[in-house]
Amino acid sequence: MTAENRPPVGDKQDKGQAVQEMFASIAPRYDLLNRVLSLGVDRGWRRAAAAEALAHSPRRVLDVATGTGDFAIELKERAPQVEIVGSDFVPQMLDLARQKAGAKQLSIRFEEGDALRLPYPDASFDAVTCAFGFRNFADYTQGLAEMWRVLTPGGRLVLLEFPPPASGLFGAVFRLYFQHVLPRIGALVSGNAGAYTYLPESVLAFPEPERLAQMMRATGFRTRYRALTFGIAGMWVGDKR
């Protein structure tokens, strides 16, 4: 996939297949790029989100858009007694997730599934998580509705995502890095310029934190937001009413 045919950004019905193809192409180097491009800070973000997801001692947790399984593995290492299921619609990512979990001798179910049509019954998970995948959904409202549907009453949703850069000096510096430095590094390491041009574009097109919180409330969640690392990342926590 080239920069010219990278996925559309924002909440768009026609981007699902393009996103699927893009992540399939970068799967082998996805983890390395995450570490390099975030300077390793993404691990701390995942730890904070895992603590929220496990706060009420869930029995079953679904990690949506699990990718190569980093967050599902974080959850299982923190709570070995909890059943963890990782779902993604990119088979190449799931293959890597299974290899990583197997190397750590962790029992995690990784299953192929579309986040907009989750293949699970109503009220079947006590917590649902999504780390840096929600931004890639073709329909944010439908994605939230599906995650609400599979949660048990009182269950918790935790979203970890990149909000648009804030205003001010730090936001300007981060925007410069995100738009001009990150795509070059990503293209060099992955060989896919389109994927790492799409990333900053998708962040800039993503809803502001309060707007996403409002969408969650409209779906039926009691919602709160926490900025991480000066707002580079954000965590939305929603409890199903």
Curated annotation (Swiss-Prot):
The keyword Cell membrane does not apply. Its EC number is 2.1.1.163. S-adenosyl-L-methionine binds at T68, D88, D114, A115. GO terms for biological process: menaquinone biosynthetic process; methylation. Pfam families: Ubie_methyltran (PF01209). Disulfide bonds: none annotated. One of its GO terms (molecular function) is demethylmenaquinone methyltransferase activity. It is an enzyme of class 2 (transferase). Methyltransferase required for the conversion of demethylmenaquinol (DMKH2) to menaquinol (MKH2). Belongs to the class I-like SAM-binding methyltransferase superfamily. MenG/UbiE family. This is Demethylmenaquinone methyltransferase.
